[in-house]
Amino acid sequence: MHRSLSRRSVVTSAMAAVAVPALRVAAAATPMLLRCSLETVPSHARNIVIRHYLRTVEAAAGGAIKTQLFESGQLFPDLQVGKALMQGQIEMAVPGSWSLTGIIPDADFFQLPILYGRATDVVHRVVDGWPGQLVARQIEDKLGARVIGRWLDLGSFNWYSTSKPLNSYADLKGLKIRNSGGAGQAWRTQFMGAVPNTTPLPNVALALSQGTFDGLITTNETIASAQFWESGIRHAFEDDQFFGEYVPIVSLDFWRRLSAELQQIFTEVWHDNIENYRASMAAAQSRARSIVQSRGIRLVVPSTEDVAAKREAMLAHQQHLASLSRISPQIVSALSAELDAG
């Protein structure tokens, strides 16, 4: 309990200056219900941020909206929330972009070699710029949904293993590695000589304990919040292979039932607080890194030169990966243009 409270304090302190909209609406006789689905556990930084957002919206709406947050995959794993939104089974979700690639292939552009090992500011330039806007439009069109604002950072994904130490890229060869979804992660796993596996996050702890796979691709925050050291994780190779982003989505059916004032509350609360939310996620990742080390997980960081060399080696296959992942030439061009402009 003490650990969870300590981790939560990192996030809440980073959000201490969050904005609350001045706009409030009169209470409705029967509030509209908003069900939000997350697959991560309650102590995860995403859950803490979204819990704060929902409470702020609910307060500003003056009783017109009642929010319910379903955590730990109680309703759906993130891989299924796109379909759930389309079918009206939930009103809101904040999935990782990788969870949407089965419906929106372009959402997998983070896995392209050109973004491998990139810094946070570079990723923000891309997701806040034209590439991110193009994908957001597709999400809205294909899911029948509304993306309410800029995307929420998760952080850098790395390699983690149970029994085999990870001292270099070569140590990944032959390992069976779980990923969170999308053709790009599977391709990169194979490029490293490992065997890809896709398992929903709520099932990972048991699968690790049973030896279903030898390791996984995830973040320090996810390792810490789920306490995966209890499932056997002992080693990490921090190559910052891609920077995860969550997409805040509200179903279009629910959105259209909102008054203009309520729609404004949804977007303004997110817009006014996204920088603090991103800062809180970064703080959570930093603390999570210390936690996983304190739990005996050995972290190895490849050199900048090794990461750049690996990126260059993968770039030779970028066109093939884009075709395999069904990422459109328009997204690849927009991504290259955004990076060249920087």
What spans do the regions from the language model cover?
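N-terminal secretory/targeting leader peptides
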Residues: 2-5, 9-24, 28-125, 137-342
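Basic, amphipathic alpha-helical recognition segments used for DNA target recognition
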Residues: 131-133
